[in-house]
Regions:
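Extracellular adhesion/carbohydrate-recognition regions
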Residues: 38-40
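Bacterial N-terminal signal peptides
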Residues: 9-20
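Structural signature of tandem-repeat unit edges
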Residues: 29-34, 45-61, 72-85, 94-108, ...
Length: 311
């Protein structure tokens, strides 16, 4: 049975004081725009759901904000190739969701789209995706692997924050920036390869991770405050392109014993595993796990705040 009617979307918990023309078809409520369909509500359901590519002959191209966020018994969802956008909080906080298949036409994934899907096991983002909203997969505690498609150039704020079972991340060489807290508190993430395309690593991007060693490629020019703070690092290699290193980048890395800067770097250098500016007049960071006594070189005229924090 198909019913078209005017409804106050707030009555369905979709938004406040928004009036829209919507259509009910089986388990979905949707709106039509320019001959295509956006699903704005799914009747509460459990188990596996395959979103149709067409409804009544019209392509389903969008999943609206919060469309499935009440389907707490949902275990699996398949998003068809017809869909090009997944809205904010579209699948937010679905504790039983273990599997998501994202269609090959999706270009944007909204803020918090899959956040707190605490049983989700893996994430594969297709090459078609060019935009991932902040915290899109944050606190997906059981996710062990993430594959990011070729279309993504920026990993935004907190996208995989607190994915504490995450052990494997595959980033393409198209990524140029890793944002604020993007992988923060991924405590099982012991190894990561930062692509040669990355130019900036944001504030706290890998803070609280289980990383044991990291090589910062020559393409990177800036590393934000606390980028690797409180991680499990034992060694770090900084490439030739880095010209800006924020405060506390390696703060509370109590296992870190050695920081190495590539000789060709124009702004920074290292000696005896300690990070300095190029002229070695400013001591930037003493690794927190450095053992024994350390004598500050005679030429040092300034020491950065927290340079010896937690040593």
């Amino acid at each position: 049975m198909r019913t078209t009617y005017r409804l106050i979307v707030a009555a369905l918990g979709l938004a406040s004081f928004i009036v829209s023309t919507a259509t009910v078809q089986a388990q979905f409520i949707y709106v039509t725009n320019n001959g295509t369909i956006t699903i704005i509500f799914c009747m509460p359901s459990g188990g596996a759901v395959a979103i149709p590519s067409t409804i009544n002959g019209l392509l389903v191209t969008g999943i609206g904000d919060g469309a499935f966020d009440h389907c707490t018994d949902l275990t699996s969802v398949t998003i068809p190739d017809s869909v090009n956008s997944i809205g904010n909080e579209a699948f937010y906080d679905l504790p039983r969701l273990t599997n998501v298949t994202i269609g090959d036409s999706v270009t944007s994934i909204g803020t918090n789209a899959f956040a707190y899907c605490s049983s989700l096991i893996s994430v594969t983002i297709p090459d078609s995706v060019t935009s991932i909203g902040d915290y899109a997969f944050a606190s997906c505690w059981m996710v062990t692997s993430v594959t990011i498609g070729l279309g993504v150039t920026s990993i935004g704020q907190g996208v995989f924050n607190s994915c504490r079972s995450l052990t494997s991340v595959l980033m393409p060489n198209n990524v140029t920036s890793i944002g604020y807290g993007a992988f923060a508190n991924c405590s099982s993430l012991a190894n990561v390869t930062i692509p040669n395309s990355v130019t900036s690593i944001g504030y706290g991007a890998f803070s609280g991770c289980g990383l044991t060693n990291v090589t910062i490629p020559n393409s990177v020019t800036s590393i934000g405050d606390d980028a690797f703070a409180s991680s499990g690092l034992t060694s770090v290699t900084i490439g030739s392109g880095v010209t800006s290193i924020g405060e506390g980048v390696f703060e509370e890395c109590t296992s870190l014993t050695n920081i190495v800067v590539t000789l060709l770097n124009p702004a920074y250098s290292s000696a005896d595993g300690v990070l300095f500016d190029k002229s070695q007049t400013t001591l930037v960071q003493c690794p927190g796990g450095k053992a024994g006594n350390y004598a500050i070189p005679n030429g040092v005229t300034s020491i950065r705040d927290d340079a010896f924090y937690d040593c």
